[in-house]
Amino acid sequence: MNNFSIISEYKPAGDQPKAIDEIIAGLSSKKRSQMLLGITGSGKTFTMANIIERTNRPTLIMAHNKTLAAQIYSEMKSLFPKNAVEYFVSYYDYYQPEAYIARTDTFIEKDSSINEQIDLMRHAATRSLLERRDVIVVSSVSCIYGLGSPDLYYQMMVNLEPGQSYLRDQLLNDLINLQYERNDIGFERGCFRVKGDNIDIFPSHYSDKAWRLSFFGNELEYIHEFDPLTGEKLAKLDKAMVFGNSHFVMPQETVNNAISGIEEELQKRLEFLKSQDKPLETQRLNQRTQYDLEMLTETGSCKGVENYSRFFTGRHAGEPPPTLFEYLPEDALLFVDESHVSVPQIRAMYNGDRARKKVLVEHGFRLPSALDNRPLKFEEWDKFRPQTVFVSATPGPFELEETGGTVVELIIRPTGLLDPECIIKPATNQVEDLISEIQTTIAQGFRVLVTTLTKKMAEDLTAYLQELKYKTSYLHSNVHTLERIEILRDLRQGTIDVLVGINLLREGLDIPECGLVAILDADKEGFLRSEVSLIQTIGRAARNSAGRVILYADKMTKSIDKAVSETLRRRQIQQEYNEKHGIIPKTINRAIHALAEFEKIDSKLDKKQAHTLFDNPAKLKTHIDKLKKEMLKAASNLEFEQAVKLRDQLKTLEAAALELS
C-alpha cells in the first residue's frame, strides 16, 4: 500500500504547524466536524495536504464550482505526484434536463453534451477509490448526485491476468456487457477491437493509453500497454482490471429484476391515473415506459436509464440514491472548501430537482420512481459524510453550530503579507475618486479590481474607463472559459490594468499584481455587500504587500463595520508575527512565472512526434483536428493552462500544415 507523500520545497510555517496539529488531534479524538478558518494567502491547500499526509486517509475535497475544484486539483496533483489525485465534477458541457411547462403544454426533451475528458476523469476517480487507498478526489457538488452502485460496478469488473484461460466469445460478451463498443476501425475510449489473436481495449479511464491482450488459444500470454495513436508499446502489465464504460452497468439478472419492478409500478400508476380520469397522461406514460422496457430487454439500457435507478439498486421509495460517498472507505476524510458557499449549495440542490420532476410525474412523462433519481437531501449528506473539516475565511452558521463555534485559525501567512489596508470614502462622486485612485495605482505598476452592484453599472463603467484610455476589461458570467483565463492572464501581464466585475471578484481569484480593490456602493446592504462578501472581496488585495481596499460608502453599515474590524484584527496579528520573526512582507509573483514557463515548455511538441507528423500531411491534419477537440474540451473543463498549451501547439502545427501544402 502506498502512503501519501508530499513533494515540495516548502515546510509548514506561520500558523500552519499549529493548525495541522490541532486538526489531527481533533480527528484522533473522533471529532466529527472541525472548522479551519483560513484567510487568503495563509496556505489552506498546503495545510490540507499536510493533514492528508499525516493521517494517511483517503480524502474527498468538495468545492462549490468547477473553477475552484480545478485549482485545488492542480495544486494537489503537484504536491502528491506519486499518489492518485482525481477530479470528479459534472461531465456535461451542456445540460438541458427534461421538463414540462403545463401552462403552455410544452415538453422539453433532455438535451446534453458530455465532456469526454471529464467523463474519463470521473471513471479514474471511482476506479482509484476501489483499487487503492492513497486517493484524493477533488469534487464539485456533483458528488451528491446519483451514481451507479459501487457493488454492481465492482461486481461487473473483468479481471485479466497473463497465464489465465479465457473463452474468447465470453470475454467479448463481457466487454459488451460493460458497455464497451466493438469498433475495428475507429479505436477510441470505451471501444475494443479484435485482430487475429489480439484484443485491444481502450479503457474508460484513459485518453492516451490502451491495452493489448495477446492470446495463444484460450490462454492470455501478455498484456501490453500501448499508445493508440502510434501503436508504440509502453509497458508490460502483470494484470489489468476492466471496469464499466458507464457507472450504470449491471448484470443481466439485475436488469431482469428491475424490469419486473418497473412493470409492477407502471400498472399501479396507470390504474391511479385512470381513477383520476386522466386518459392523456395514462396513454403517454404507458407508451413512454413500454418503449424503455423494450430497450432494457434488448440492450440492457435505455435513454434516461438513471430514472429507473431505484430498481437497479434494489432500494425502496424515498431511500437515498448511491453517490460517490458510497465509494469512499469508512475511514475517509472530507474537506469542504469555501464552506460558507458550499454548504448552502448542497442544501439547495434537492428542492430544485424535485420540483421539476414532480411536474413530469404528475403529467405522465415519468413514473414516481424517477423522483428517487436525485441528489442527496441535506440531512442525508450530513448523515453520510465522514469526519469533516470545513474550510473558509468566513464560516457559515451551519459550520459554527456543528463545531460549537470552535475554530482552528490559519491567519498568519508564512510570506508575512498583511491583510490590506481598508479605507472608507464617500460614495458621492465615487467614480471621479476611483479614476484618481486608478491613476495612482497604475503609476505604481499595479492592477485594479473594481466591483459594482449591477451588470449595467459594470458595463457603463467599463465603457467610460475605456473612453478615458484606461486598459479596462469586464468580467461577467457570459465570458467563455478560455476568454476568462485570457482576461486574467492579460490583467496579470499588464495588457489590462483595470478589471470590472460584479460577483466574480471573490473566492478563488488570485492576482498578486492587484494593488487596489475598489468596492462601489459598499453601504448597500444585501447579498453582494454582506459581511461575508466584503471579507472575501477584501481578500483579493491580500496577495500584494502594497494592497489597499477602498470601500465607497455614505454610511457605516454593520457589514462594513464587522468586515473592516475583522480585517484589522488579522492585520495586527500578522504584524506582531512579522516583528517577532523579523519578516518583511513581500509580494510573491511565482504563479505567473510558473504559467509562462508552463506555456513555453509545453507549447513545443516532442521532436520525435513532430518529425513523424510533419512527414505525413494526412496524419498531421488528423492530429490538428484531434488537438482542436482537446482544446475545446479543456476549455469547457476549466483547465485553462491546458487549453492555452493546446492552442499554442495548434498554431505551430497549422503553420507547418500551411508550409506542407
Swiss-Prot record:
Domain Helicase ATP-binding: 25-182
Top-level taxonomic group: Bacteria
InterPro entries for this protein: Helicase/UvrB_N (IPR006935), Helicase_ATP-bd (IPR014001), Helicase_C-like (IPR001650), P-loop_NTPase (IPR027417), UVR_dom (IPR001943), UVR_dom_sf (IPR036876), UvrB (IPR004807), UvrB_inter (IPR041471)
Pfam family, one: UvrB_inter
Domain (Helicase C-terminal) ranges: 430-592
Motif Beta-hairpin location, chain numbering: 91-114
GO cellular component, one term: excinuclease repair complex
One of the GO BP terms on file: SOS response
The keyword Amino-acid biosynthesis appears for this protein: no
Record note on domains: The beta-hairpin motif is involved in DNA binding.
Family per similarity comment: Belongs to the UvrB family.
Protein name: UvrABC system protein B
Organism expressing this protein natively: Rickettsia peacockii (strain Rustic)
Gene that encodes the chain: uvrB
